[in-house]
């Protein structure tokens, strides 16, 4: 334990010595004199435009109904197909007297 502490203290002191030497080698920098900067004229502020209200969202158009003529125009093949699919109605017999 003692060896570790001694080793650490030696390294720290060595680092400090090196740091001091390096600091002494580099002379401290002098602050550079500030150059006179030409002042900019402040830009004129333009008046803010009033906020434009967004137009209300348009309602979705209702689906257009097909004209009656289009509904009636059913092809013959479609009618036949529908007739095959439809359940056949039982023919009612007239009651016997």
From Swiss-Prot:
UniProt cross-references to InterPro entries, sorted A to Z: H1/H5 (IPR005819)
Chief subcellular location: nucleus
Region annotated Disordered, chain positions: 24-97
Top-level taxon of the source organism: Eukaryota
Compartments in which it is found: Nucleus; Chromosome
GO BP: nucleosome assembly
Extent of Basic residues compositional bias: 31-97
Gene Ontology annotations for the cellular component aspect, listed alphabetically: nucleosome; nucleus
GO MF terms, alphabetically ordered: DNA binding; structural constituent of chromatin
The keyword DNA-binding belongs to this UniProt entry's keyword annotation: yes
UniProt keyword annotations, A-Z: Chromosome, DNA-binding, Nucleus
The protein, known as: Histone H1.C2
Organism expressing this protein natively: Trypanosoma cruzi
């Amino acid at each position: 334990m003692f060896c570790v502490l001694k080793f650490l203290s030696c390294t720290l002191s060595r680092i400090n010595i090196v740091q001091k030497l390096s600091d002494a080698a580099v002379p401290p920098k002098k602050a550079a004199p500030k150059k006179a900067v030409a002042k900019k004229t402040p830009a004129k502020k333009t008046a803010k435009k009033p906020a434009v209200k967004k137009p209300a969202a348009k309602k979705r158009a209702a689906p257009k109904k097909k004209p009656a003529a289009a509904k009636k125009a059913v092809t013959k093949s479609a009618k036949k197909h529908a007739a095959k699919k439809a359940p056949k109605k039982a023919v009612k017999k007239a009651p016997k007297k």
